Amino acid sequence: WFALDTSTGIETAGSKLYMRLTVVSFDLLVYVPALIMFTKTWLSPRSKRTQEQALLLLLLQPALLLIDHGHFQYNSVMLGLTLLALDFFATGQDLIGAVCFVLSLGFKQMALYYAPAIGSYLLAKCIYLGPRTGLAHFTRLGVVTIASFALLFLPFYIPSPSHIIHPIQRIFPFSRGLFEDKVANFWCASNVLIKWRKLAGDNESGRSWLVRTSAALTALGFIPSVLVLLRSGWTMRLRTPSHST
């Protein structure tokens, strides 16, 4: 239970203004530049007017304005960093893009939604580049990614190496069960008709089974897309004999 009338925290006009200003500030620092770069990069063949219309449409996205900004989730920062990664990938700056995506993952674990596609794209590019160039590119990406994660987790590691487990548990909150944070949409929706926890057993082994099952089905769902991306890298390589080295 919770105290409905006394657990709301500070709700002064000044605190609300401060929180809203932080959202606007982070949007101006991360999200808006990412959108501007996106329209200029991905819509470069189109007219300037079309680019401006696309930018305005993206800036007025109702989901961010009405929901995320309303309760200060700062999802625009995560989305902005992911979009910056895609922008840099599109311009051939894969290493900078990898750093941006690591920052996105570090900011909010929801960026894991995009990890299979981004990882598959980069691996497909390494395949396309050929054994020698592709392996060198893969190595550079690996070093940059590991170094970026190491710097992110360093503040947790320095006081005590055991502290590093806490952010990892927050990124992968399996210990909280399948219905953590209402992000398991299929399971929450289907639970109206099929009581999954009752079916699996409302105990530790039952919760563990649900987590393993959902993870396996999630992987099964995105594996076809991963294979398509990897195959595209291989077929493009076969069509380009100049990348055989």
Q: Could you describe each region identified by the protein language model?
A:
Residues 52-57, 99, 138-143:
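Hydrophobic alpha-helical transmembrane segments
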Residues 42, 48, 83-96, 126-129:
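Membrane-interface transmembrane helices that cradle and orient dolichyl/undecaprenyl
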Residues 63-66, 84-85, 95-114, 245:
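Membrane-interface alpha helices of multi-pass inner-membrane proteins
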Residues 2-9, 29, 34-62, 239:
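Transmembrane-helix signature of polytopic, membrane-embedded enzymes
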Residues 40, 88-89, 107-108, 141:
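Intrinsically disordered, low-complexity, Ser/Thr/Glu/Asp/Lys/Arg-enriched terminal regions and linkers
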Residues 1, 5-23, 61-72, 76-81, ...:
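Membrane-interfacial catalytic/cofactor-binding modules of polytopic membrane enzymes
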Residues 114-146:
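Perimembrane helix-loop-helix junctions
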Residues 30-38, 81-89, 116-123, 147, ...:
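Transmembrane alpha-helical segments
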